[in-house]
Design a protein with these regions (language model features):
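Glycine-rich FAD pyrophosphate-binding loop
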Residues: 32-55
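Active-site lid/adjacent beta-loop-alpha segment flanking the redox-cofactor pocket in flavoenzymes
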Residues: 258-340, 344-346
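Glycine-rich active-site loop/strand segments that organize a redox cofactor
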Residues: 51, 55-85
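Central helical "cap/lid" subdomain
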Residues: 210-260
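Extreme N-terminal leader/targeting segments of oxidoreductases
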Residues: 1-15, 33-34, 38
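Flavin (FAD/FMN) cofactor-binding and adjacent substrate-gating region
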Residues: 66-72, 96-179, 187
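C-terminal catalytic lobe of FAD-dependent flavoproteins
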Residues: 167, 318-378
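Helical element adjacent to the flavin cofactor pocket in flavoenzyme catalytic cores
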Residues: 156-220
Length: 378
């Protein structure tokens, strides 16, 4: 039961954004930046963002060379280049909005490991890929460098080469989301957590967003609604082609004299690791168990964790003493290709979801485009 005051002051908004991850909060911020007097509400089902925005490894990246070679065959050159440019634009928007200090951005470079048992055929396309990307970046993006294998302390018997991207970096995911939350609040955006949106109803005048909590159920009202729930979107729109993909992540104890510095990936990006100070954060392995990892359930997959630990001990930090301090999971959203799903569902409802594991890079750009849709008739 709502009071008179709640009905009068706390239920009605100009815009409601469902989902308080990178895309959702950024969408609310863009709308507020462009329309300062707008009354905006963000609803989040968890006490913290539910999907991957606070659970990712903190890669400020555009994707590895092998990923791009694969994606070129999957979607063609025009779509690939647009996607890469959008990732780059998104990273610059995120850094500009929050500042590098607030997100602890470090431009330590990105590295793709080419393992001994892998074909290095994509390295043969390095020059041609650089040619394709030069109009966007005004420089060569990739170069091969075998010398860094020993410099980082890797097992050189397991790795035949590395491809370097000096444009990439890393962030502190927790600081970034904290800064984004604080920035949104400073603009006057209202954020309610623990509000599980169950139903969205629309008529010709407004949209009702039904949110449930352990205490009550409330129908919030807005002129327009933005859906930014990524892997959890099919709960509201079951017909959409959005498939969840769970990511397993672990973090080591502090390691003395750790040489690893930067962001790293291998096996077409299915495995990824980085240093955080003198620790290693390592995630991935979804391709070991696609079926089991196609879920929105936050559970550890022991098969994948065991493989991560094996790569750590045998290849990444083979001569170090450490323990695994923590494991966790994040839920991403994937589709038939690498393209995000950005569309109007009606005149009053639009969505920006399915970021294919690239939310840090794409979230701020998708937010700009989603805000364009939300404000198009205003």
């Amino acid at each position: 039961m709502l009071s008179f005051w709640e009905q009068k002051e706390l239920i009605h908004y100009d815009y409601i954004v469902v989902g308080s991850g990178i895309t959702g909060l950024s969408t609310a911020c863009v709308i507020k930046e462009r329309k300062p007097n707008a009354h905006i509400l963000v609803l989040e089902r968890g006490l913290l963002p539910t999907g991957a925005s606070t659970k990712n490894a903190g890669f400020a990246c555009i994707g590895s060379l092998s990923e791009k070679v694969y994606d070129l065959a999957l979607m063609g050159e025009d779509k690939l280049l647009q996607l890469i440019e959008n990732r780059w634009i998104g990273l610059q928007l995120l850094r500009k909005r929050l500042g590098d200090t607030a997100i602890d951005f470090q431009n330590n470079g990105g590295y793709e490991l080419i393992l001994n048992h892998e074909s290095n055929s994509h390295v043969e396309q390095l020059s041609s890929m650089n040619d394709r990307l030069r109009p966007i970046f005004k420089q060569d993006v990739f170069k091969e460098d075998k010398n860094k294998i020993n410099a980082f302390g890797f097992n050189a018997n397991k790795i035949q080469s590395m491809v370097v991207n000096s444009l990439e970096g890393q962030i502190n995911t927790g600081k970034m989301m904290n800064a984004l939350h604080q920035y949104a609040s400073s603009l006057g955006i209202k954020i309610i957590t623990g509000a599980d949106v169950s139903v969205i109803e629309e008529n010709d005048k407004y949209v009702l967003v039904h949110a449930n909590s352990s205490y009550n159920n409330i129908a919030f009202k807005a002129s327009k609604v933005a859906i930014c729930t990524n892997a959890f979107t099919r709960k509201l729109f079951p017909h959409l082609e959005i498939n969840p993909g769970r990511g397993q992540v672990l973090v080591t104890s502090p390691i003395s004299d750790l040489k690893v510095k930067g962001i790293f990936s291998f096996d077409e990006g299915f495995y990824y690791f980085r240093n955080f100070e003198n620790r290693i954060i390592f995630g991935g392995g979804r391709n070991l168990d696609f079926e089991k990892e196609a879920t929105t359930s936050f559970e550890t997959n022991e098969k994948i964790i065991a493989q991560l630990q094996q790569y750590l001990s045998e290849m990444i930090i083979p001569n170090y003493s450490y323990t695994i301090e923590q494991t966790w999971t994040g839920i991403m959203a994937f589709g038939p290709n690498k393209l995000p799903l950005l569309q109007s569902m009606s005149d009053r409802i639009a969505m920006g979801v399915r970021l294919n594991g690239m939310g840090v890079a794409l979230g701020s750009k998708i937010a700009e485009d989603l805000a364009d849709i939300m404000l198009s008739d205003d």
